Amino acid sequence: EIGVRLVGSEMCIRDRRITGRELRKDTISLPGNVSSQYISALLMIAPVLTNGLTIRLTGDIISRPYINLTLQLMNDFGVRAEWTDDHRLKVEPQAYHSTPFYVESDWSAASYWYQIVALSKEAEVTLPGLFKDSYQGDSQVAGIFRSLGVETIYKDKAVILKKNGKSVERLDYDFINQPDLAQTFVVTCALLNIPFRFSGLQSLKIKETDRMAALITEMRKLGYILHETDGSVLSWEGERCTTEEHPAIDTYEDHRMAMAFAPTCLALPEILINNPQVVSKSYPRYWEDLRQAGFIIKEV
């Protein structure tokens, strides 16, 4: 739509040829319910386009904190990028400027360590490089896990996670602004026997896989029957089925499926994770870090 010439199959990116040329179109419209990765990609190239770019988002906007994170980091590197109203983003032609920058650790990745603490009888974990006043929308993980008995102690450029044992009897939450945390909480709540209703999950269908369908399928292997409603809600009201004797979790080429299900070994005799290498997308040291924390991991 902004002028890039694509030749080849629409279904397979490996069969496409992209022809570069000057991109002059300065306005584009796209649905606000697409993955924020598409919006962030357009924002980041916008300053170097001939006429800049105005992005109009239609309908409901999901994952707004991820968009705001992109805007904040662009501003940190000298580019003015901003909302002009609730559904419109504008970036003028301008140049990025290099600047010293401390890269914060990933709160999304931290969620799996919160999960480990929540599923443990006693645990304390220190995670370096995380800030209380974080740009990242997924830093809300600390507040949500407080409901599941995990306390967060903020230090200088680090957090300490401790089990306090005080969990809610039920958890209802709208993940519209933190969809990448949903898998972690689905698995954690079920294993803690905490019924839940999680809404705002419509973007899970357009991630690395249809995460809603994947969660329903894989949680059934562990003996939990989840229900999807309106394409945006996952719920569990305590309904159980027979647990597979040797559950093997399929990861669907999705890094978050592997990392959300691995900690289930704390509540089950064992768990098998198929295609564990998928974690390389966002957390390549995940398995090594688990080993250092005392988990026994074997390749089969």
For each feature predicted by the language model, list its residue ranges.
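Conserved loop->alpha-helix
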Residues: 134-151
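Flexible, glycine/charged-enriched surface loops at secondary-structure junctions
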Residues: 78-89, 123-130, 149-161, 195-196, ...
